[in-house]
């Protein structure tokens, strides 16, 4: 099976901005003269800059050990009542109850979501590493 992106980012080594592209065509650009860019979300890796030597591309794929993946997989959340500003939470920081709700939702609504397996692996990881 082909490996797939779970995290797509670029760091501009001139200004230090860390750019994260979370979804297809989520074009991000730093604010300095180097104009570092990151695009493609979790569909493809695209990066650039005026000086390519002054950027560092950092991507994580689903063939990495779960101990690594859990630090980079993110889930958007608007809070329990869906009334909060969107924020992204790393899988390692999602509380157990929230993780159970996520898994239940994905199983019922989006059973083919490629992250469902990662969420279930996180439950096993937590049980094993308590």
Q: Which residues does each PLM region occupy?
A:
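Short, intrinsically disordered terminal segments enriched in charged and Pro/Gly residues
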Residues: 1-8, 40-71, 115
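A short, structured loop/turn motif at beta-sheet edges
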Residues: 23-25, 32, 94, 126
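Residues immediately within or flanking Cys/His clusters that coordinate Zn2+
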Residues: 9, 26-29
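Cys/His-rich microdomains that often coordinate metals
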Residues: 16-19, 34-38
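Short Cys/His-rich "knuckle" micro-motifs
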Residues: 21-25, 39-43
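Short cysteine-rich clusters marking metal-coordination/redox-active sites
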Residues: 12-15, 30
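Short amphipathic alpha-helical interaction elements located at domain edges
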Residues: 64-130
């Amino acid at each position: 099976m082909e490996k797939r992106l779970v995290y797509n980012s670029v760091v501009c080594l001139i200004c230090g901005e860390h750019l994260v592209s979370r979804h297809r065509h989520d074009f991000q650009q730093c604010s300095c003269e180097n104009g570092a860019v990151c695009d493609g979300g979790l569909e493809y890796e695209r990066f650039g800059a005026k000086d390519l030597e002054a950027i560092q591309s950092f991507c994580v794929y689903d063939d990495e050990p779960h101990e690594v993946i859990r630090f980079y997989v993110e889930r958007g959340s608007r809070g329990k009542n869906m009334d909060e500003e969107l924020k992204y939470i790393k899988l390692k920081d999602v509380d157990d109850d929230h993780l159970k709700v996520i898994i239940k939702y994905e199983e019922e609504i989006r059973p083919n979501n490629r992250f469902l397996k990662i969420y279930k692996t996180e439950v096993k990881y937590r049980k094993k590493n308590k």
